[in-house]
Each structure stands twice: as C-alpha cells, then as structure tokens.
From Swiss-Prot:
Region annotated Necessary for nuclear and nucleolar localization, chain positions: 90-133
Organism expressing this protein natively: Homo sapiens (Human)
Name this polypeptide is given: RAD52 motif-containing protein 1
PROSITE patterns: RRM
Expression sites (tissue/organ): Expressed in testis.
Region feature (Necessary for nuclear localization and for nucleolar accumulation in response to heat shock): 1-92
Record remark on domains: C-terminal half (amino acids 134-284) contains cytoplasmic retention domains as well as determinants involved in its stress-induced nucleolar accumulation.
Alphabetically ordered keywords of this record: Cytoplasm, DNA-binding, Nucleus, RNA-binding
Length: 284
C-alpha cells in the first residue's frame, strides 16, 4: 500500500499519539523537548503538546503528538509503548481515539509548515517558488473611488500574488494565488506604520499563494521508500491507495499553469485541534 500525505493539518486519529505516565519532575517545556527528540526519529512531527494531568489524577503530565504520516505514528507507537525513553519509569503510548464522531474540514498548512514538509520528503533544495505576479490593488481601488467622488474615511492595503511551486525532481509545477487586504488609516497611523503594514501585507500575499500552491499537491510514499508527487488542483484526497494504482506517478509531470484568474476561497490558517476531542485509553 502507498500512503498519501497531503499538505494539510493532520487531524486523523491514526496520525495522533497519546502519551501518558509522564513524570512530574521535569517542567512541561523540558518534557516537550524530550518528547520531540524521542518521537521525531520516526517521522516528521506536526506538533507536540504537553498538558498537566487532571486534578483528580496523580501529579504528572500527558502529551498529544501529531505526525504527518500514519505509518510513522504506528512505528512510533510500537517502538515507544511501555518503554522508559527519557525517564526512569515507562511511558504508555496509544493511537488517538475520539470521544465522538467528529468531522472536520481539512485545514491548509501555513506556508512555513508546507515548506518544512516539502523539505523533509524532497530535500532542502527539492522545491522552490517562482513569483509570476505581485500586484498592489489598493491604488486601483483608490482611483476608482476618486473618479466616483465618494470620500472614504479609511483605506485598505490589498495585494495579489500569483506564483508556482516547482519540484524539479518530479518535473512538477503547481500554481497558487493569494489575496490579502489590510485595513488602515494613513493619517492616524503615520507614514512609518503605513510602510510597515504595506510590507507585511505584501509578505502575507506571497505566503498565502505559496500555501495555496502546495494544497494542490499530494506526497506519495511508496512501500519501496520512493517518493512521488501527485497534482490534484480541485480534489481532496486523503488516504492510502494500492501501489499498482499509483504506478508511474514518479515520472508523470504535473499539469501546467491553469485557471490563473479563477477566484480562490479564503486562506485557511494553521490551527490545532483541541485536546478535549481525544481521551486517554483505558489503562491496561
């Protein structure tokens, strides 16, 4: 079986590990570092979150660890369950289970997380971005308002960015667009604040376009260990397929730039699920 790894926040239970019986001696920050070091050897981690035990339980901590890959989470669970790892007493590790059937819309990773995931699978020089267009739309709207003689007490900075992510090893290019609008008042905030907000809005537009481009890609991890990429501009695909169905993906180039002017939905930020959605398994 081949595993598909999307550029999305991992919310599946089989990508989430619950770790408990953590000692009360170290601080939460120290435990976070130790857990990250111990579990990152099995695969790239999306997040490590450490929480104190409930007041009715004995002193100590538990943790919620999210992997991008379900295979990596399974390997980590088998290797670390009932092992001492970094403390004198063994910890218990289980795959996550939910209180109830909760369905979440897949959330897009932010641009930095997308680049981190791409670097992990394709190498630090395995992908790059090419900005096709970066345009400020604020002046256009301002001229339209001047022509109509409609006074505006406040203005907004608006930037549009179109770019493409390039994966040379897979002969793949994926387009993305981003639009950012930042309300402001040039008179109240002053010229320095205006310049800073303008620079920030420009940067956010690039980041949103970069994230949008990555959302159209799926990382394909074959059983042989080879890595491929699949380009799907308008479909949400999460799961595992048989390797025969994915045969040839490594040599199949992605589609060129399409639908450049198509309006995209708003950018989804990088969120984490609340820990209350999971429960600790029954102790053996």
């Amino acid at each position: 079986m081949a595993e598909l790894v999307p550029f999305a926040v991992p919310i599946e239970s089989d990508k989430t590990l619950l770790v408990w019986e953590l000692s009360s001696g170290p601080t939460a920050e120290a435990l976070h570092h130790s857990l990250f070091t111990a579990f990152s050897q099995f695969g790239l981690l999306y997040s490590v979150r450490v929480f104190p035990n409930a007041a009715v339980a004995h002193p100590g901590f538990y943790a919620v660890i999210k992997f991008y890959s379900a295979r990596a989470a399974h390997r980590a669970q088998k290797a670390c369950d009932r092992k001492q790892l970094f403390q004198k007493s063994p910890v218990k590790v289980r795959l996550g289970t939910r209180h109830k059937a909760v369905q979440h819309q897949a959330l897009a990773l932010n641009s930095s997380k997308c680049q981190e995931l791409a670097n992990y699978y394709f190498g630090f020089n395995g992908c790059s971005k090419r900005i096709i267009k970066l345009q400020e739309l604020s002046d256009l709207e301002e001229r339209e308002n001047e022509d109509s003689m409609v006074p505006l007490p406040k203005q907004s900075l608006k930037f549009f960015c179109a770019l493409e992510v390039v994966l040379p090893s897979c002969d793949c290019r994926s387009p993305g667009i981003g639009l950012v609008e930042e309300p402001m008042d040039k008179v109240e905030e002053g010229p320095l604040s205006f310049l800073m907000k303008r620079k920030t809005a420009q940067k956010l537009a690039i980041q949103k376009a970069l994230s949008d481009a990555f959302q159209k890609l799926l990382i394909v991890v074959l059983e042989s260990g080879k890595i491929a990429v699949e380009y799907r501009p308008s479909e949400d695909i999460v799961g595992v397929r048989c390797e025969e169905e994915l045969h040839g993906l490594i040599q199949v180039p992605c589609s060129p730039w399409k639908q450049y002017g198509q309006e995209e939905e708003g950018y989804l930020s990088d969120f984490s699920l609340e820990e209350e959605e999971f429960r600790l398994p029954e102790l053996d």
